[in-house]
Amino acid sequence: MSQGLQQQNNDHLVQSDDPEHPANLIPELCRKFYNWGWVTGTGGGTSIRRGEHIFIAPSGVQKELMQPHNIFVLQYPTPKYPPSERKYIRKPLDLKPSACTPLFLAAFERGAGCCIHTHSQWAVLVTLLVEREKGPEGCFEISNIEQIKGIPKGPGKGMLGYFDTLRIPIIDNTAFEEDLTGSLEKAMDAYPDTYAVLVRRHGIYVWGDNVAKAKTQCESLDYLFQLAVEMHKLGIPWVK
């Protein structure tokens, strides 16, 4: 390995005894998400922004086996496109950057501290149900369910209440992950209070101000999606 490559690798950025360090948190989160069935077959991804650094899980690594030394680090801010212009300050030499990177960056540009992408079966199923019931332009809506309180109303607006209606936009899938970026950003603009975007037949992107908020919001949404699927089986409407 050349001296230049060694210098570029900046291993110190992912070496820490602090369990709250992003390089330690991302593998821990990925193991949890794998055990929950959200990120099978190396799918999905997680990214955390800390100050001027963005830490991103790599592509193609089994989520339950991920280690801190697998993590990519970007200087922030950094261009979304073209990929060659992104300011990587640590690149594991034997791994590929996540195809989710430009979508994570779109969330960080809106103030997020963490963004999670899962392939949850419940998320996929609700996109199919919405498409069948409302057509391709429909969004997911649900109300009068206690767990809705786990989702924010919007930046600086507090949390949704029991009687509020949660709305999550849905975008069409594409052949390549990076090509979702434009549609994701349009959905963010059309739904400025949303903290999540569903991808039809694919999964969901969820972001939050910090790791804890992104994780708990993702958990709350997955609960609501599963509940919605079961409600649909029983003929119970999602919005009361």
Swiss-Prot record:
Active site: E146 (proton donor/acceptor)
Entry annotated with the keyword Acetylation: no
Cofactor: record remark: Binds 1 zinc ion per subunit.
Binding of substrate, residues: C100
EC number: 4.2.1.109
Stored InterPro entries: Aldolase_II/adducin_N (IPR001303), Aldolase_II/adducin_N_sf (IPR036409), MethylthioRu-1-P_deHdtase_MtnB (IPR017714), Salvage_MtnB_euk (IPR027514)
GO BP term, example: L-methionine salvage from methylthioadenosine
HAMAP family: Salvage_MtnB_euk
Protein name: Methylthioribulose-1-phosphate dehydratase
Protein species of origin: Emericella nidulans (strain FGSC A4 / ATCC 38163 / CBS 112.46 / NRRL 194 / M139) (Aspergillus nidulans)
Lineage, opening ranks: Eukaryota, Fungi, Dikarya, Ascomycota, Pezizomycotina
Gene that this polypeptide is encoded by: mde1
